[in-house]
C-alpha cells in the first residue's frame, strides 16, 4: 500500500472513530443515574441528562416508559413512584442510540451536604477502622460530588456509585455513612448517600448567584 492510500485509510478510520465517539457521547444521563444508582422510593422520580440531538428521549424502568423532547441540549423525564427493591435496569434511548443503566436499587436517598463537619471522613473518626472493616453492604450505595467550584451551574459531574465496603467507606463522610448505616438497619431498604460537602463554605456558595444577591446580607 502506497503512502497516499495509507493516508486515505487513516483519514477514513479517524473520521469513522470521530463519528462513532460523537454518536456515543451525544446522549448522556446525569452521573446520578449510572450503574449501581439508588432512586428515592414512594415519590415521583426525575431523571435527566444532556444530548446533542433534538429527537425525543425515552426512559424505561420497572415497566414504565416515559419520554421528553430535549430543550437547549437538556432532557428531563419523570417516573411514577416506585416501591423499594431492585435491582432494575434503566434503558435510555434516542433514535438509534441506546444506553442501559444497570443494578439500580430503589429505597431512601439522602444528600450529605455541608461544611467540614460533613466532610470529615470515616477513616478520621473514632472507631473508623472497625467501621471500615465491617462495612460490606450492597444495600448501601455511595457517590461523591467532586469538590470544585464553578461560576455557573453545571449540568453534570464526574462520579460513580459504589457499594459500601472497605475500599469505599474510608474516604466517605463519617456523619453521612454512620447515618446511612443505622437507617438501613432500621428500614431494611436500600440507602443511597450523595456526598456534596466542602469545609469552610458559606451558604451563598451553595446558591445560584442570582438568588444569593437578593439576600441583603450577602451584598455587604
Where are these regions (language model features)?
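N-terminal non-cleavable signal-anchor helices
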Residues: 4, 19-22, 58
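Bacterial N-terminal signal peptides
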Residues: 10-20
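Cell-envelope and extracellular/periplasmic
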Residues: 24-220
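Bacterial N-terminal signal peptides that target proteins for export
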Residues: 1-11
Amino acid at each position: 500500500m502506497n503512502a497516499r492510500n495509507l493516508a486515505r485509510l487513516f483519514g477514513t478510520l479517524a473520521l469513522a472513530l470521530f463519528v462513532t465517539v460523537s454518536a456515543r457521547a451525544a446522549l448522556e444521563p446525569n452521573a446520578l443515574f449510572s450503574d449501581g444508582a439508588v432512586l428515592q422510593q414512594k415519590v415521583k422520580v426525575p431523571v435527566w441528562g444532556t444530548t446533542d440531538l433534538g429527537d425525543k428521549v425515552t426512559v424505561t424502568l420497572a415497566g414504565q416508559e416515559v419520554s421528553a423532547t430535549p430543550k437547549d441540549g437538556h432532557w428531563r423525564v419523570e417516573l411514577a413512584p416506585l416501591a423499594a427493591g431492585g435491582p432494575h435496569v434503566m434503558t435510555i434511548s434516542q433514535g438509534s442510540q441506546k444506553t442501559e443503566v444497570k443494578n439500580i436499587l430503589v429505597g431512601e436517598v439522602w444528600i450529605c451536604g455541608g461544611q467540614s463537619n460533613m466532610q470529615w471522613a470515616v477513616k478520621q473518626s473514632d472507631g473508623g477502622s472497625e467501621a471500615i472493616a465491617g462495612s460490606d453492604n450492597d444495600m448501601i450505595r455511595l457517590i461523591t460530588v467532586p469538590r470544585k467550584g464553578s461560576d455557573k451551574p453545571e449540568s453534570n459531574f464526574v462520579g460513580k456509585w459504589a457499594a459500601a465496603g472497605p475500599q469505599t467507606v474510608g474516604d466517605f463522610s463519617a456523619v453521612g455513612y454512620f447515618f446511612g448505616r443505622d437507617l438501613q438497619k432500621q428500614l431494611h431498604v436500600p440507602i443511597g448517600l450523595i456526598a456534596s460537602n466542602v469545609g469552610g463554605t458559606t451558604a451563598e456558595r451553595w446558591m445560584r448567584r442570582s438568588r444569593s444577591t437578593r439576600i441583603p446580607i450577602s451584598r455587604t
